[in-house]
UniProtKB/Swiss-Prot annotation:
GO terms for biological process: absorption of visible light; G protein-coupled opsin signaling pathway; visual perception. Photoreceptor required for image-forming vision at low light intensity. While most salt water fish species use retinal as chromophore, most freshwater fish use 3-dehydroretinal, or a mixture of retinal and 3-dehydroretinal. Light-induced isomerization of 11-cis to all-trans retinal triggers a conformational change that activates signaling via G-proteins. Subsequent receptor phosphorylation mediates displacement of the bound G-protein alpha subunit by arrestin and terminates signaling. It holds the Pfam family 7tm_1. The gene is rho. Gene3D superfamilies: Rhodopsin 7-helix transmembrane proteins (1.20.1070.10). Glycans are attached at N2, N15, N200. Residues 1-36, 97-110, 174-202, 275-286 are extracellular. This is Rhodopsin. The chain crosses the membrane at residues 37-61, 74-96, 111-133, 153-173, 203-224, 253-274, 287-308. Belongs to the G-protein coupled receptor 1 family. Opsin subfamily. The modification N6-(retinylidene)lysine is found at K296. The lineage of its organism: Eukaryota, Metazoa, Chordata, Craniata, Vertebrata. Residues 62-73, 134-152, 225-252, 309-352 are cytoplasmic. The keyword Transmembrane helix applies.
Amino acid sequence: MNGTEGPFFYIPMVNTTGIVRSPYEYPQYYLVNPAAYACLGAYMFFLILVGFPVNFLTLYVTLEHKKLRTPLNYILLNLAVADLFMVFGGFTTTMYTSMHGYFVLGRLGCNIEGFFATLGGEIALWSLVVLAIERWVVVCKPISNFRFGENHAIMGVAFTWFMASACAVPPLVGWSRYIPEGMQCSCGVDYYTRAEGFNNESFVIYMFIVHFCIPLAVVGFCYGRLLCAVKEAAAAQQESETTQRAEREVSRMVVIMVIGFLVCWLPYASVAWYIFTHQGSEFGPPFMTVPAFFAKSSSIYNPMIYICMNKQFRHCMITTLCCGKNPFEEEEGASTTKTEASSVSSSSVSPA
């Protein structure tokens, strides 16, 4: 084995020299240069500095503007709440521990940080899935005479919390476990070992299939069908410039949304699966740390994609920030009017 396994931790370094120490008790500067821990702390500070205002502003603007409190926007608020979970439950902890060079908060702190970081990430993941399903149902109308209402929106939000809990809770009660990962300053599910009594193998397989492959397939299907519907509507009105413009806008949004989803979860899931299927192989701490950066960064670019790209949200945010006035109001209004003129409005398919 090219690593050192201890009680509730796994260090990706063979302890031939005797320098490996518990990540709960000693700085891990023998793994990477101490400057790397400073960079990690600075990166977490950046995510907090940007992620908190953007997501908090989303909640505040929605409370301030009644027209935003529609059932279709409930899932976006849920996404903002999930990102705030990651900011407070994960980023702040990782920033603090990276300043010490090890997981100074101990085993209990590892469980708490791992739980909240996983819960927030999973709520965000399933929010994107529910969002894709909602857009598909509203635009493609696979169910005739179906009207999307508040009860459906609440059910969608409840579903995200249920699925997130189904992923974040088991490691707390014995199905797998949370251990320090990467540079040993943050905690995640144990992909690294086959520790007795924790059934890590079955949990990792369950996570990979249920919490990555299925969401990826659903998002791909829904946005694929949505693109087809938009292109069919545009083809039926080829003479309409506004329809063609809306079709291009929606296509661009869908591509960005799918790419955002893949950038967030594909690196992390792929590396986690590789580590699980190659347990005992040699890999350095950055191997798991870098993909986690992509997943954590979603707390910034998810709001940018799913909220700021929506004309209505964007208009209300600018109005709130500019004390009730929107200096770009004429441009926003003209763009919205043109889009609404098309048979398939981009606002119906856009991220909000």
